[in-house]
C-alpha cells in the first residue's frame, strides 16, 4: 500500500465514520500521515489548508502508530473528529494549551458518539480513548479489519511487528451460554453469569 492509498483509506473512513457516528455533520478536513512521536494523532484548530477561498482543518495520524490494529487507528481518528466537532460547535474541550481534555466538553461529546470510551489520565485529563463494541462492529461491517496501514506495508517492506492476528480483533466466547465479547488485545476474561473462563474463538 502506498502512502497515498493509506491517506485515501483514512479519508474514506472519515466520511463513513462521520455519517455513522456524527450524523454527517462534520465539514470536510484534510487527512495527513506525518511523524508524530508523542501523539497518536493531532487536530489543527485553524484552517491549515486552503483551496481558493475555502479553508480546511487538518487531522494528522502519526506515521509511527499505523502498525496498531485497525480498531485502534479508527479510535484515534474518531478522537480527532471529536475535537473537530467541538471546534465547529464552539464547545470548549481542552485547556492548558490543548493538552488537558476536560469532562464537560471532550468526554461528553466523545462518549456521546457511541464510538469510543474515554479513560482518565491525571496529566492530560480525559484524553485516552478506546474503541467501543459498536465501532469494532462497524469496522467489521465495512471490511476494514484486514487492512494493513503499517509503515512496512506503506514502504513495501517485508514483515512487521508480528502482532499475531491480522485484523487486531479477538472474539472471546463463553463455552456455556455462548455470550461473546470483542477485544483488541489478548485478555483473560470470564463470564460472570456462568462463572466460566471465556475462550478465544479461533478464526
Where does each model-flagged region fall?
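Conserved glycine-rich acetyl-CoA-binding loop
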Residues: 71
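An amphipathic alpha-helix signature
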Residues: 74-75, 107
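Active-site recognition of the HExxH zinc-binding catalytic motif
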Residues: 75-88
